[in-house]
């Protein structure tokens, strides 16, 4: 095994870890954001479901693995050079890792495509730009808008169904103690100061005290959660929505594992380190990528989790369920068709849709995230150019 091949394997391992750190929480962000679970509970659920989806990539991900191997995008003589795939993996991993440290949810798919373009431009031969647009860029552009539109539509439908069934939404009133500084009037007292002939009398008419009082708050305190009041098919509506919300979050984790594992394994296939026809080596590749992705999520997802759960929009569990349903549907269906959509664009786009529908979108943060999306591909491309020149 050459030094370049060792570097390639290390870069793919780093990309797997960075992908988990940035992407694993995207399915369970709604659980965390609605206080349905704690951060720890959410990240473990994300790990379990992502691992399950990653292992299914062995059975269902052949189309995506082939698409992201680079075959057809660049010539076979380029793919035969391990420097090419190593540069792609280094660029994608660096881009995603930097975004994770800054707390921005970005697209690993964008980063990989940027790496393929940058390294492809420097390598001998030509990049098939028509295939690049059809296979990669078009799905990436459509996905966030599709997620927003579907979320708005489903939110409206589900809300009308809820009202038709007589299920109301309750917001609690928080009542708690709070100490206040108050001025207390007291009887006039004559206070002697000084000694002997210098003694004078001064009056004291009051003092300040801390006294407990009652404070009332309505709305978004941690102890106040919106709940659904009523029954659906004989089941408590709030309990049913919570269960469906939890399952939908798991479905996004599964879909993400299926999509992104196949994309990363595709780099190993492109470098001919493993093959689609050699199912034994392919299984090992899928398993290693899956484990490293899970570790990345467990160890380094906190900053992205705060952004996704608390900084994009306020939401309740019903809205979280809607966002997750849209995300998982888009990601799983596109994976089966071999379209490389971004789980990030789908999940965050769905959260944008929730914010627009409920009127609680935080536009300053949304603008920052969109800007991070726009620069992901060119940054990865530039890093791939530099990495390819250094390695080769």
Please give the residue ranges for each predicted region.
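Interfacial segments of multi-pass membrane proteins
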Residues: 30-39, 113-127, 267-278, 348-360
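Intrinsically disordered, low-complexity non-transmembrane regions of multi-pass membrane transporters
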Residues: 159-248
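Short, non-helical or kinked segments that cap or interrupt transmembrane helices
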Residues: 21-28, 36, 102-114, 259-267, ...
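Hydrophobic alpha-helical bundle architecture
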Residues: 101-104, 309-343, 359, 369-373
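Membrane-interface alpha-helices at helix entry/exit sites of multi-pass transporters
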Residues: 35-48, 135, 278-283, 317-322, ...
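Alpha-helical transmembrane segments in multi-pass membrane proteins
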Residues: 8-15, 45-53, 57, 61, ...
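Helix-coil boundary and interhelical linker segments in multi-pass alpha-helical membrane proteins
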Residues: 1-6, 74-80, 122-135, 270-284, ...
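Transmembrane helical segments that form the transport core of multi-pass membrane transport proteins
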Residues: 248-323
């Amino acid at each position: 095994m050459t030094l370049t091949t060792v570097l390639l394997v290390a870069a793919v391992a780093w990309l797997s870890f960075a992908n988990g750190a940035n992407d694993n929480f995207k399915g369970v962000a709604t659980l965390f954001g609605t206080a349905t679970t704690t951060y720890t509970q959410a990240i473990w659920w994300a790990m379990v479901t992502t691992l399950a989806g990653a292992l299914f990539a062995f059975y269902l991900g052949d189309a995506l693995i082939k698409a992201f191997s680079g075959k057809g995008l660049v010539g076979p003589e380029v793919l035969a050079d391990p420097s090419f795939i190593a540069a792609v993996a280094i660029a994608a991993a660096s881009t995603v890792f930097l975004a994770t440290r800054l707390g921005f949810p970005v697209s690993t798919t964008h980063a990989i495509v940027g790496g393929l373009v940058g390294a492809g431009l420097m390598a001998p031969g030509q990049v098939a730009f028509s295939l690049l647009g059809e296979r990669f860029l078009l799905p990436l552009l459509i996905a966030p808008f599709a997620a927003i539109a579907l979320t708005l539509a489903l939110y409206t439908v589900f809300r009308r169904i809820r009202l038709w069934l007589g299920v109301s939404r309750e917001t609690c009133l928080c009542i708690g103690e709070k100490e206040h500084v108050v001025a207390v009037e007291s009887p006039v007292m004559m206070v002697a100061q000084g000694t002997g002939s210098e003694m004078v009398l001064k009056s004291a008419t009051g003092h300040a005290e801390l006294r407990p009082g009652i404070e009332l708050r309505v709305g978004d305190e941690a102890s106040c959660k919106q709940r659904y009041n009523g029954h659906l098919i004989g089941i408590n509506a709030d309990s049913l929505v919570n269960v469906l919300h939890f399952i939908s979050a798991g479905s996004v984790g599964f879909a993400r594992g299926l999509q992104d594992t196949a994309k990363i394994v595709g780099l190993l296939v492109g470098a001919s380190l493993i093959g689609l026809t050699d199912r034994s080596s392919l299984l090992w590749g899928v398993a290693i990528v899956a484990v490293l992705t899970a570790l990345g999520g467990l160890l380094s997802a906190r900053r992205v989790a705060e952004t996704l759960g608390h900084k994009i929009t306020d939401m309740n569990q019903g809205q979280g369920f809607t966002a997750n349903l849209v995300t998982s549907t888009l990601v799983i269906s596109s994976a089966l068709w071999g379209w490389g959509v971004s789980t990030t664009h789908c999940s965050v786009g769905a959260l944008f849709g929730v914010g627009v529908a409920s009127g609680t979108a935080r536009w300053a943060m949304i603008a920052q995230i969109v800007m991070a999306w726009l620069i992901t591909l060119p940054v990865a491309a530039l890093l791939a150019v530099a990495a390819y020149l250094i390695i080769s």
